[in-house]
């Protein structure tokens, strides 16, 4: 599969931004500490989220804020912003199966539409889930553990 960790890093970052944007400046270093990745990765992800109009981020230590309400940010929006799948789709099909082999010559006809259905289904599910859903579940878990921001 071609989905990278950028997707879950972006979801984590957006949840963090939502919970802390009114309490402190949300910097790349704060996000990197929470997510446990290099700040360079955070900057790359935030840049893509900013390009997609999901966050407002200021250069330097200006911090990041949400540009849209959580219920207007779907997981699909995030996926498309940070983990764009190229024209080959989610699954990269080996390019040159042997055309004279009984399997190689027919595998694309047998598998291509199924793979596309899997990708379409995944994308449809991502469209149904918003960051509001994620932060709601996150807050419930924090409350269950007696944690707060």
Report residues per predicted region.
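Short alpha-helical segments that sit at the start of domains
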Residues: 1-14
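Short amphipathic alpha-helical interface segments
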Residues: 13-22
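A short alpha-helical element within helix-turn-helix/winged-helix DNA-binding domains
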Residues: 26-35
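Beta-hairpin "wing" of winged helix-turn-helix
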Residues: 52-61, 65-67
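Conserved segment of winged-helix/HTH DNA-binding domains
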Residues: 70-96, 115
